[in-house]
């Protein structure tokens, strides 16, 4: 049964081909260098979502926006029960240990989405694009 990741790919490939048709799984698979059967197994939830390089190829073939690509990463990570694949390098950067400490502290205190929304807003005020 397809999970959220597979449903996302299925939804995003509809109507995105030149002329408004659907992008075929075999075309996505070819760009990824895998068989259509293997990709079909991923989309149907019989195999885990692929790693970052392959996710980027999916995003490219489907003409995903930056926001849609981030959603693709999140869904892949969630389905693999891992952090989204674009995050580990930043999370593990030894120059910024407070990232891990803050996440652990927030987890211990069971801080929810309301807290992280405030953090997100602060990052938008302070951060660099």
Each model region followed by its residue ranges:
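Short alpha-helical DNA-recognition segment
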Residues: 18-41
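Interfacial/linker helices and their anchor residues that mediate assembly or domain coupling
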Residues: 77-129
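Short, charged amphipathic recognition helices of the HTH superfamily
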Residues: 18-26, 51-55, 86
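Amphipathic alpha-helical "recognition" segments
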Residues: 36, 51-52, 69-89
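Recognition helix of helix-turn-helix/homeodomain-like DNA-binding domains
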Residues: 33-49, 57, 75
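DNA major-groove recognition helix of helix-turn-helix/homeodomain DNA-binding modules
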Residues: 53-70
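A short, Lys/Arg-rich alpha-helix, primarily the initiator
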Residues: 1-24, 107, 111, 116-122, ...
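Residues in the recognition helix of alpha-helical DNA-binding motifs
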Residues: 12, 42, 72
């Amino acid at each position: 049964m397809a999970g959220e990741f597979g449903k996302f790919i299925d939804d995003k490939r509809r109507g995105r081909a030149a002329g408004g048709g659907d992008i075929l799984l075999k075309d996505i698979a070819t760009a990824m260098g895998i068989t259509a059967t293997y990709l079909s197994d991923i989309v149907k939830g019989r195999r885990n979502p692929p790693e970052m390089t392959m996710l980027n190829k999916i995003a490219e073939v489907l003409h995903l926006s930056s926001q849609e690509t981030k959603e693709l990463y999140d869904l892949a990570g969630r389905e693999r029960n891992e952090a989204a694949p674009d995050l580990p390098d930043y999370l593990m950067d030894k120059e910024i240990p407070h990232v891990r400490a803050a996440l652990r502290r927030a987890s211990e205190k069971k801080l929810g989405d309301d807290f992280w929304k405030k953090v997100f807003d602060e990052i938008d005020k302070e951060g660099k694009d």
